[in-house]
From Swiss-Prot:
Periplasmic compartment spans: 20-160
Gene Ontology MF: a single term: lysozyme activity
Protein name: SAR-endolysin
Annotated catalysed reactions: Hydrolysis of (1->4)-beta-linkages between N-acetylmuramic acid and N-acetyl-D-glucosamine residues in a peptidoglycan and between N-acetyl-D-glucosamine residues in chitodextrins
Biological classification of the source: Viruses, Duplodnaviria, Heunggongvirae, Uroviricota, Caudoviricetes
Role according to the record: Signal-arrest-release (SAR) endolysin with lysozyme activity that degrades host peptidoglycans and participates with the pinholin and spanin proteins in the sequential events which lead to programmed host cell lysis releasing the mature viral particles. Once the pinholin has permeabilized the host cell membrane, the SAR-endolysin is released into the periplasm where it breaks down the peptidoglycan layer.
Gene: 45
GO biological process: cell wall macromolecule catabolic process; defense response to bacterium; killing of cells of another organism; peptidoglycan catabolic process
The species this protein was found in: Pseudomonas phage phiKMV
Length: 160
């Protein structure tokens, strides 16, 4: 039903993702202490790793497409481009567990507005075994919600 973003839509989504994530060519620990590089890549990353800007770009595309596939497989109703992009950003940030979220449940119930708003629930990180609200995650979720609620006459299933 829904299809992967391509062309200008993909380029815009990647630019938005880099704006949310930033891009670091040297591995660092994220707020939860996970070794991370480039624009949020964590798979196989260890402290001391380095990447070129081109390698970061390629990692970001690969990661975005992996999480977009998770969204497309889990959401059974048509998504417009903004909804699809926001849900992919969300999954990129929280990982495959995104499919268990209230947001995904609401979308699959045909309640897109409530699904977008439910992204706000995912605003905490675990620090020393405690869930703590993160200002950075609050800001990120607000950006994702804004993207998600932005009207679009194009549905991702009709882009190509």
């Amino acid at each position: 039903m829904n299809k992967p973003l391509r062309g200008a839509a993909l380029a815009a989504a990647l630019a938005g993702l880099v704006a949310l994530e930033g891009s670091e060519t040297t591995a660092y620990r994220d707020i939860a202490g996970v070794p991370t590089i480039c624009s949020g890549t964590t798979a196989g990353v260890k402290m001391g790793d380095k990447a070129t800007p081109e390698q970061c770009y390629q990692m970001t595309i690969k990661d975005f497409q992996r999480f977009e596939r998770i969204v497309l497989d889990a959401i059974k109703v048509p998504l417009n481009v903004n909804e699809q992009t926001a849900l992919t950003f969300f999954c990129y940030n929280v990982g495959p567990v995104c499919t268990t979220s209230t947001a995904f449940k609401r979308f699959n119930q045909g309640r897109a507005t409530e699904g977008c708003q439910a992204l706000a629930m995912w605003n905490k990180v675990t620090i020393n075994g405690q869930k703590v609200v993160s200002k950075g995650l609050v800001n990120r979720r607000n950006a994702e919600i804004k993207q998600c609620l932005e009207p679009s006459s194009q549905y991702s299933s009709l882009l190509w």
